[in-house]
Curated annotation (Swiss-Prot):
Belongs to the TRAFAC class TrmE-Era-EngA-EngB-Septin-like GTPase superfamily. AIG1/Toc34/Toc159-like paraseptin GTPase family. IAN subfamily. This is GTPase IMAP family member 2. GTP binds at residues 31-37, 50, 57-58, 147-149, 184, 318-320. It comes from Homo sapiens. Detected in T-cells. Residues 56-60 are annotated as: G2. Residues 29-36 are annotated as: G1. The gene is GIMAP2. CDD domains: AIG1 (cd01852).
Length: 337
């Protein structure tokens, strides 16, 4: 049995309480992003095996401890269990081990991703985090970007503001905008500065959560096992069954949420189309009204011109007759020579 697992149910199984100053952190995310190296940077020692490359060296969940100020830091490193497509026996075994090592619950989940390379695999890993720990775990999650050196001295906030990766922006928003960046090659004061920045972010999160760690039904099941090792094998089996059911429930919840999101988007699209049709009809009606008004004006103008013409036709002959009569009278009065 691993020294970090004092029983089937982890180090707190026999009723011992975690220290108030203990800070439990779980490293999550896809393989190859630098999770283990990030854990080493936080603890400032080679606690987890790590090297450059996309192949993971972490084969199983492991735990290491260190300190920062007056806090004892407990970090749980995880293997490639967030990228597996199949829900196989190995996945359930590692998830169960992760729960045991992090009982009674993590204060922080560090979702590690590489700066500038948030891919569909990272999205799948983030989705698996929700399946394993629950949707509410996002409220205790900080997105940690590795390869901070790629910012070239720029601001991480500016990077996020300028990013056109909608999936990444959605993830950061779900995590309450909590982000941090690491250069896992940093040493000395540079390493201390970036760890301090992360710890400040964690302290803000803990203040927001009133110092409470994250928990769910599975952690509660672990805590209920504090009565001792009696029937421990049955309890382990019970936990596994509960874990499978929990993950299936989370998948169903996610699928339902996505369906509702698509349904909402469809409804919004339909409303937008109806609004456009209504606006188009209103414009047509307005155009017809204007055309009708112009026709009425044209008809009135035409009628006035016809009336004027008719009046002129009536007045001109009359004036001509008067003129002719006048001429005739003048001729009659003029004496002949």
């Amino acid at each position: 049995m691993d020294q970090n697992e004092h029983s089937h149910w982890g180090p707190h199984a026999k009723g011992q309480c975690a220290s108030r100053s203990e800070l439990r952190i779980i490293l999550v995310g896809k393989t190859g992003t630098g999770k283990s190296a990030a854990g080493n940077s936080i603890l400032r020692k080679q606690a987890f095996e790590s090297k450059l490359g996309s192949q993971t060296l972490t084969k199983t969940c492991s735990k290491s401890q260190g300190s920062w100020g007056n806090r004892e830091i407990v970090i749980i490193d995880t293997p490639d269990m967030f990228s597996w497509k199949d829900h196989c026996e190995a996945l359930y075994k590692e998830v169960q081990r992760c729960y045991l090592l992090s009982a009674p619950g993590p204060h922080v989940l560090l979702l590690v991703t590489q700066l500038g390379r948030y891919t569909s695999q990272d999205q799948q890993a983030a989705q698996r985090v929700k399946e394993i720990f629950g949707e509410d775990a996002m409220g205790h999650t900080i997105v940690l970007f590795t390869h901070k050196e790629d910012l070239n001295g720029g601001s991480l906030m500016d990077y996020m503001h300028d990013s056109d990766n909608k999936a990444l922006s959605k993830l950061v928003a779900a995590c309450g905008g909590r982000i941090c960046a690491f250069n896992n090659r940093a040493e000395g004061s540079n390493q201390d500065d970036q760890v301090k920045e992360l710890m400040d972010c964690i302290e803000d999160l803990l203040m927001e959560k009133n110092g409470d760690h994250y928990t769910n039904g599975l952690y509660s099941l672990i805590q209920r096992s504090k009565c001792g090792p009696v029937g421990s094998d049955e309890r382990v089996k019970e936990f596994k069954q509960s874990l499978i059911k929990y993950m299936e429930t989370q998948r169903s919840y996610t699928a339902l949420a996505e369906a509702n999101c698509l349904k909402g988007a469809l409804i919004k699209t339909q409303l937008c189309v109806l609004f456009c049709i209504q606006l188009f009809l209103r414009l047509i009606i307005l155009w017809l009204c204007i055309l009708h008004s112009m026709c009425n004006l044209f008809c009135c103008l035409l009628f006035s011109m016809c009336n004027l013409f008719c009046s002129l036709l009536f007045i001109i002959p009359k004036k001509l007759m008067i003129f002719l009569r006048t001429v005739i009278r003048l001729e009659r009065k003029t004496p002949r020579l």
